[in-house]
Swiss-Prot record:
PANTHER family: CORNICHON-RELATED. Belongs to the cornichon family. Keywords: Developmental protein, Endoplasmic reticulum, ER-Golgi transport, Membrane, Protein transport, Receptor, Transmembrane, Transmembrane helix, Transport. Acts as a cargo receptor necessary for the transportation of gurken (grk) to a transitional endoplasmic reticulum (tER) site and promotes its incorporation into coat protein complex II (COPII) vesicles. Associated with gurken, produces a signal received by torpedo resulting in a signaling pathway that first establishes posterior follicle cell fates and normal localization of the anterior and posterior determinants, later they act in a signaling event inducing dorsal follicle cell fates and regulating the dorsal-ventral pattern of egg and embryo. It is found in: Endoplasmic reticulum membrane. Residues 32-56, 144 are cytoplasmic. GO terms for molecular function: signaling receptor binding. It is a multi-pass membrane protein. Its main location: endoplasmic reticulum. The keyword DNA-binding does not apply. GO terms for cellular component: COPII-coated ER to Golgi transport vesicle; endoplasmic reticulum membrane. The lineage of its organism: Eukaryota, Metazoa, Ecdysozoa, Arthropoda, Hexapoda. InterPro entries: Cornichon, Cornichon_conserved. This is Protein cornichon.
Length: 144
């Protein structure tokens, strides 16, 4: 059992993906609170907007590690989500600070539904990735 850069990459990806899972869970809970009118949109957007860039940068960093160690399948399964993140951030509403969520439009039914669906899809992708990263870590530790 040897420790190599691929195993290190998968270990870092597991830790980073755990953070991404928590971000996605927080995203889903936050929009469920908005849907049930538990919190007001200004407070909710103020708590969600600072988490957008760290989530995107962490996801891109993990995929740069996969690129550097030559794990092409791991990189390819994440490229669609990275492309969506870039598209979503380019087409964000005009605001004074970084973020995606505008308090004036976040309560519209279609926007709320789209954001909830986005959170659930991200959670599913991150969970599937987490279990694949466990497999990749074990395989890279055993194979060398």
């Amino acid at each position: 059992m040897a420790f190599n850069f691929t195993a290190f990459t998968y270990i870092v990806a597991l830790i980073g993906d755990a953070f991404l899972i928590f971000f996605a869970i927080f995203h889903v809970i936050a929009f469920d609170e908005l849907k049930t009118d538990y919190k007001n949109p200004i407070d909710q957007c103020n708590s969600l907007n600072p988490l957008v860039l760290p989530e995107y940068l962490l996801h891109i960093f993990l995929n740069l590690l996969f690129l550097f160690c030559g794990e092409w399948f791991s990189l390819c399964i994440n490229i669609p989500l990275i492309a969506y993140h870039i598209w979503r951030y380019k087409n964000r509403p005009v605001m004074s600070g970084p973020g995606l969520y505008d308090p004036t439009t976040v309560l519209k039914t279609d926007t709320l539904y789209r954001n909830m669906r986005e959170g659930w899809i991200k959670l599913a992708v991150y969970l599937i990735s987490f279990f694949y990263y466990i497999y990749g870590m074990v395989y890279s530790l055993i194979s060398t």
